[in-house]
């Protein structure tokens, strides 16, 4: 399962709640969402493969809650690396949230299927 932006956050949530998905792709996920980091801090994902990506300019937001996105995705990736049975990957892309979403989503799914 995978998605971009809020759909990316939903895909991550699915990967924590259900064992139906072996891989999760989350391109520019809305990990700034209030409560998300507390949620993942107390759970282990059920998906065995998790791909994250974010644009390097996404944290340059005027809205303070949304500006936490880069710190949160880095913290999430650090959490995922603690699990030896979860393969995770974080890719930093050039630009903001709306730069090349189709390409970034495609790259995520290519990673998920192992090509």
What are these regions (language model features)?
Residues 1-45:
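Primarily recognizes the serine-hydrolase "nucleophile elbow" in alpha/beta-hydrolase
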Residues 14-16, 25-29, 48-62, 93-95:
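Cell-envelope and extracellular/periplasmic
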Residues 9, 60, 98-100:
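Short catalytic/ligand-binding loop motif for oxyanion handling, primarily in non-cytosolic enzymes
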Residues 38, 64-65, 102-105:
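Short aromatic-enriched loop/helix-cap "lid" or pocket-rim segments at secondary-structure transitions
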Residues 20-24, 47-49, 84-88:
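Loop/turn elements at helix/coil->beta-strand transitions in domains of secreted/extracellular proteins
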Residues 59-71:
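Short, flexible/disordered intra-domain loops and linkers
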Residues 53, 70, 74-115:
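C-terminal catalytic histidine-bearing segment of alpha/beta-hydrolase fold enzymes
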């Amino acid at each position: 399962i995978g998605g971009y932006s809020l759909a990316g956050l939903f895909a991550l949530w699915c990967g924590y709640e259900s064992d139906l998905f072996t891989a999760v792709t989350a391109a520019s996920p809305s990990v700034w969402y209030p409560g998300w980091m507390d949620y993942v801090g107390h759970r282990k994902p059920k998906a065995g493969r998790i791909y994250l990506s974010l644009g390097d300019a996404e944290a340059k937001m005027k809205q303070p809650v949304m500006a936490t996105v880069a710190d949160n995705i880095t913290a999430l990736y650090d959490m995922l690396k603690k699990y030896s049975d979860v393969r995770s990957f974080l890719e930093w892309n050039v630009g903001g949230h709306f730069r090349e979403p189709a390409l970034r989503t495609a790259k995520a799914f290519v990673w998920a299927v192992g090509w």
